[in-house]
Amino acid sequence: MSLHRDSMVPVNSRLENMDSPILSKICAWGVMLGLFALSLFAMAYACYHKQTSNSCIEEKQGKKQVLKPLDMEPKIVVIMAGNENPTFFAKPTQINA
């Protein structure tokens, strides 16, 4: 700490107040923005990498893929509980009312 030539007020020439809440908030914001930028970069790279690999695969195959029909039956299993073990499996049926 030194005194300014024209005044009697001490002047800090170095950072002595490193435990300031403002400094820690600025550092926290910097870390958060850095992580945000890193995640955006990773997502952009993954998207670009996926698009280029899909175009390479399509060029190598040279034909269109045929879509298989979807199974329209619901995949539901009902387990009827017994005393010690499940007694049987039930398959749901459609009721026409």
Swiss-Prot record:
Taxonomy, superkingdom: Eukaryota
Cellular component terms per the entry's GO annotation: membrane
Topological relation to the membrane, as annotated: Single-pass membrane protein
Transmembrane segment boundaries: 26-46
Gene Ontology biological-process annotations: amino acid transport; regulation of amino acid export
InterPro entries: GDU (IPR040359)
Residue intervals annotated with topology Extracellular: 1-25
KW Transmembrane (keyword) present: yes
Segments in the Cytoplasmic topological domain: 47-97
Compartments reported by the entry: Membrane
Keywords: Amino-acid transport, Membrane, Transmembrane, Transmembrane helix, Transport
Tissue specificity statement from the Swiss-Prot or TrEMBL entry: Expressed in the vascular tissues, even in the minor veins of the leaves.
Span of the annotated motif VIMAG: 78-82
Record keyword Iron-sulfur present: no
Comment field on protein domains: The VIMAG motif is necessary for the function of the protein.
Comment field (misc): Overexpression of GLUTAMINE DUMPER 7 leads to free amino acid levels accumulation.
Function: Probable subunit of an amino acid transporter involved in the regulation of the amino acid metabolism. Stimulates amino acid export by activating nonselective amino acid facilitators.
Family: Belongs to the GLUTAMINE DUMPER 1 (TC 9.B.60) family.
Protein name: Protein GLUTAMINE DUMPER 7
